[in-house]
Amino acid sequence: MKIVKISPRGYCYGVVDAMVIARNAALDTSLPRPIYILGMIVHNKHVTDAFEEDGIITLDGPSRLDILDKIDSGTVIFTAHGVSPEVKQRAKEKGLTTIDATCPDVTKTHDLIEAKKAEGYHVIYIGKKNHPEPEGAVGIAPDIVHLIERADDLKTLEIPTDKILVTNQTTMSQWDVQHLMEDIQKKFPTAEFHKEICLATQVRQEAVAKQADVADLTIVVGDPKSNNSNRLAQVSQEIAGTKAYRVADVSEINLEWLQGVENVAVTAGASTPTPITKEVIAFLEQYDPMNPATWERVRKVPLQKILPRVKVKKEQ
């Protein structure tokens, strides 16, 4: 079996930065305890489990405000997906120490929404409902930001001005966003468009589109909650024309997928730890359908190998 290692794949700078911020927080003895992450720091359970070992507690819930209600003291880390001004204000009112790990690409979108609100615009925001990134973006200006996920949402959308900005969640499929923007243009011809697919997401999607077409199967390594991982599987199927499955790690690979397969493409979401992806590749490289000794699929990567290394500051 030939393995096509799609490149680039895996961690983006925003994810690594967020994890380094959280690791440094865990090592900072001056920060009030306990230390919480408001939702998953990045959408990968292996990462959140590793942070639990570091003493950082991940809390999840239907919204960031709901999660904040569970916290009475300590330090709160805002995730890479960003939060609304209301969340920041609520944390301040509760007397919590806050650390912001928002991805710079997300912050750029928030700043754009604020600037356009000041100019009297309404904003159509393309994103996934119940995902934390759109929650934070809509929360920047909930009175003028309209979240849509698919073309059907446009049917009932009415906006009381011709001053309209269209932007999007950074981890969406660039092809889905383009198609939706074309539909929006037809209904709102005066709209201005700012496509905000982050560069890391874009190049990973384009790599799958161009490199997975030679494979019989694509395996995307990523968490089920990771939107960018799910979009990579979608791109493989819809753009490259190659059947795709998403797995959290090697243990989720179904041997039936590999029957009759000669070429397997492997990629990974931007929040997927590199050792987890390497373990998947190593399994596929040694797999022999005629040798049961090669069929074992057990994640063996220790949690301490998941998180990026940080330098411990020496006391003066």
From Swiss-Prot:
Its cofactor is [4Fe-4S] cluster. The keyword Cell inner membrane does not apply. The active site is at E133. Binds 1 [4Fe-4S] cluster per subunit. It comes from the Bacteria. PANTHER family: 4-HYDROXY-3-METHYLBUT-2-ENYL DIPHOSPHATE REDUCTASE. This is 4-hydroxy-3-methylbut-2-enyl diphosphate reductase.
